[in-house]
């Protein structure tokens, strides 16, 4: 097992979270075979090492205190006598013995190690990419340790950047560093503070420059919404300000326009990407522009309780006011919806307490799904999450109150159901754009299944986390336990991208974990009864 954020000899962890709309077209290519890997697996407080086919490289009957349960190419890291060691695939050669007692998970295949009170960077072959010279080192980006997008290092309370492979991007000049979500979604830019001044750093080019804002609020259509304190403005992809920082609110940039409000009680309108007013403020609410238009709620005399209509880039109304509510089209639990470029979710009230929802295509200016669903959202241009009024429900407790929440399914644009409602409360598109994640509950530590875009089940909902590794052709399944700040994760199964199992664990006998290969053949332990504790003699205990 691995424990998150620990720097000493203790388990360590990382995880992935799902993003949206990474792929718009279904990938029909045949998945690549599993890459060659060395995979430590820990069960029953013992650790064995497998290859990508589930064959055993190192038996579980060994002297290792723990192994780092991270798949590497041809090595693995284990602890013994309070020190971390790097070994070859079958453990017959110790490549880097006793190299540290302070290990950090950084980026894939790269690790921080401590020596004489200083940290350096090591690759998975044991090469010291950066010699120990740093007071501090950790992974950077909006991803957990071990899956970082870059590396942050500190010297004398100043911080600098290393690339994902450990090369120097900046000198240690900065007091703080901030990432906007996934840096890949923000052109590689990172915000930094240096001597009370605001800077941006481009991780890809190494460019640094001073800017007049201190926060990225949104990034879309190659433009940023940025802010300084409570005032917002628009910047281009190079972080050049296109407007003054004077707006109370700005929406998400889309198709050359961005919504704005100058003050809290102002009406909203739209700016173009030159910072000029394209549609004068005349609306109570303004949504993101698609290629054809955007949804707006006109100002009314009854306190803004009118309906939404669809307008063109000229401001001309293209539809009559129709919808009681509109919002982002990516479904998420608890109403925390996210933007889907080119789509808007629509809603119509059925009575004071019930609303039905649909999907409007703002690129084409057409209604894709009429408001007939109690929940709906976009996965891809041809796939939608949905729940109908008669869909099965599950009991969900939130803030101590129990209520019934509809279960979700997946259908295509023609209405064909690919995943029936009944089991899942949350369904999202995987970051790769090639897979669908389906969660049985709304919490982080819920069982997660993985499907392909045709609705084929690849990984059953037996474990709490499924990591997609396209480069290796692998799907890794992990069990999660503990609180978010003290979480452990244990590798429990490996599948190919088409859902063929390579190995998995199962519970047998007296709750003993047993590893089996893809054909169901036992790998280890072959004698699970030996891991059962001695039965207690209750009568003898009572007699004493």
Which residues are covered by each model-predicted region?
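C-terminal motif of bacterial Sec signal peptides marking the signal peptidase cleavage site
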Residues: 20-23
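Residue-level detector of conserved, function-critical positions
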Residues: 25-544
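Bacterial N-terminal signal peptides that target proteins for export
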Residues: 2-12
């Amino acid at each position: 097992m691995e424990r998150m954020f620990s720097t000493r000899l203790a388990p360590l962890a990382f995880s992935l979270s799902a993003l949206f709309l990474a792929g718009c077209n279904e990938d029909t290519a045949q998945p690549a075979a599993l890459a060659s890997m060395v995979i430590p697996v820990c069960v029953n407080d013992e650790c064995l090492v497998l290859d990508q086919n589930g064959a055993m490289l190192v038996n579980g009957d060994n002297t290792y205190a723990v192994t780092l349960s991270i798949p590497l190419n041809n090595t693995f890291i284990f602890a013994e006598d309070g020190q971390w060691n790097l070994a070859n695939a079958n453990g017959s050669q110790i490549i880097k013995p006793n190299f540290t007692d302070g290990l950090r998970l950084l980026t894939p295949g790269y690790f921080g190690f401590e020596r004489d009170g200083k940290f350096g960077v090591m690759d998975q072959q044991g090469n010291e990419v950066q010699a120990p010279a740093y007071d501090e080192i950790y992974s950077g980006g909006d991803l957990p340790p071990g899956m970082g997008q870059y590396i942050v290092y500190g010297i004398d309370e100043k911080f600098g950047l290393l690339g994902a492979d450990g090369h120097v991007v900046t000198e240690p000049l900065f007091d703080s560093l901030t990432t906007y979500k996934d840096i890949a979604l923000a052109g590689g830019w990172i915000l930094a503070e240096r001597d009370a001044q605001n800077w941006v750093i481009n991780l890809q080019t190494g460019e640094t420059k001073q800017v007049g804002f201190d926060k990225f609020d949104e990034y879309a259509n190659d433009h940023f919404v940025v802010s300084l304190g409570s005032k917002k403005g628009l910047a281009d992809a190079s972080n050049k300000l296109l407007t003054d920082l004077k707006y109370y609110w700005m929406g998400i940039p889309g198709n050359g326009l961005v919504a704005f409000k100058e003050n809290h009680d102002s009406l909203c309108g739209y700016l173009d990407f030159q910072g000029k007013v394209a549609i004068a403020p005349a609306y109570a609410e303004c949504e993101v522009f698609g290629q054809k238009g955007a949804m707006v709620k006109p100002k009314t005399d009854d306190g803004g309780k009118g309906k939404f209509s669809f307008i063109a880039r000229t401001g001309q109304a293209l539809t009559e006011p129709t919808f009681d509510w509109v919002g982002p089209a990516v479904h998420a639990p608890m109403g925390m919806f996210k933007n889907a470029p080119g789509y808007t979710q629509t809603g119509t009230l059925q009575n004071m307490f019930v609303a039905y929802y649909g999907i409007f295509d703002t690129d084409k200016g057409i209604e894709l799904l009429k408001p007939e669903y109690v929940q709906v959202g976009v996965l891809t241009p041809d796939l939608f999450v949905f729940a109908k009024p008669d869909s099965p429900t599950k009991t969900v407790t939130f803030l101590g109150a129990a209520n019934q929440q509809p279960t979700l399914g997946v259908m295509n644009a023609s209405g064909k159901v690919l995943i029936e409602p009944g089991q899942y409360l949350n369904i999202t598109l995987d970051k790769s754009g090639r897979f669908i994640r389906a969660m049985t509950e709304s919490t982080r530590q819920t069982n997660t299944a993985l499907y392909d875009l045709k609705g084929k089940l690849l990984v059953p909902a037996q474990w709490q986390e499924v990591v997609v590794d396209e480069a290796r052709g692998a799907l890794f399944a992990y069990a999660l336990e503990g609180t978010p700040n003290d979480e452990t994760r244990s590798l429990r199964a490996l599948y190919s991208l088409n859902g063929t199992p390579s190995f998995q664990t199962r519970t047998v006998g007296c709750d003993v974990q047993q590893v089996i290969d893809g054909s169901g053949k036992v790998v280890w332990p072959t004698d699970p009864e030996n891991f059962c504790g001695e039965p207690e003699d209750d009568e003898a205990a009572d007699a004493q």
